[in-house]
Amino acid sequence: MSRIRAVLFDFGGVFTPSPFDGARNYGAQIGASPERVLELVFGPYHEDTDHPWHRLERGEMALVDARNAIVELGRAEGVDADPFKLFASMANGPRGAYDAMIARARAVVGRGYRTALVTNNVVEFRESWRKMLPADELFQVVVDSSEVRMRKPNPAIFRHTLALLGDVAPEECLFLDDAASNVEAAEKLGIRGVLVKSDLADALAALDALL
């Protein structure tokens, strides 16, 4: 087995509360099916489709237009699938556990590993999410889906990240993400994957064991 030389991190659900958990919790709050709200807002996340949220994450659509389209999808089913309300419902969540992941990423950098952030994200969120963690300190490479016009689980975004990192093979990389489909996509390329759950404990232990 190849020695790990680079660690790739997702953002949401790894350094911040998972938007997937947020969607499920929001669905429960409004009396709708949590899984249906998740799919209405974020689309079939195991795929890369033309759902409004996927187009938004590829930088093909403005946030306000994607939000309006998703609200209409929900309205057709009698569900208030408003992404803005979903994210507002997450605003006061805990941060302590995620500070532990930031500390672990800092330790990874200190041990000489190459690091990258590979995030499905939104142009309009760029300023706010970059204030949540010291990206320039923690990552040699930042790959934002809305900038590179491709999103996980498309394998092209992983190939692009490895090209930016330089002389590193997929088998020498470890990837942490809270979406199983993204982890599986990375693993198909030979990257070792760690699925991050909401309490982070298993992911932190796996990270320690593999490095």
Regions found by a protein language model. Give the residues of each.
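N-terminal helical cap/lid subdomain that shapes the substrate entry/recognition surface
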Residues: S2-A103, G110, V122
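Generic structural signal for well-ordered alpha-helices
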Residues: I102-A105, V183
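Short glycine/serine/threonine/alanine-rich loop segments
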Residues: A32, Y113, I191
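Asp-based, Mg2+/Mn2+-dependent phosphohydrolase catalytic module
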Residues: M1-F9, V109, V118, V122-V123, ...
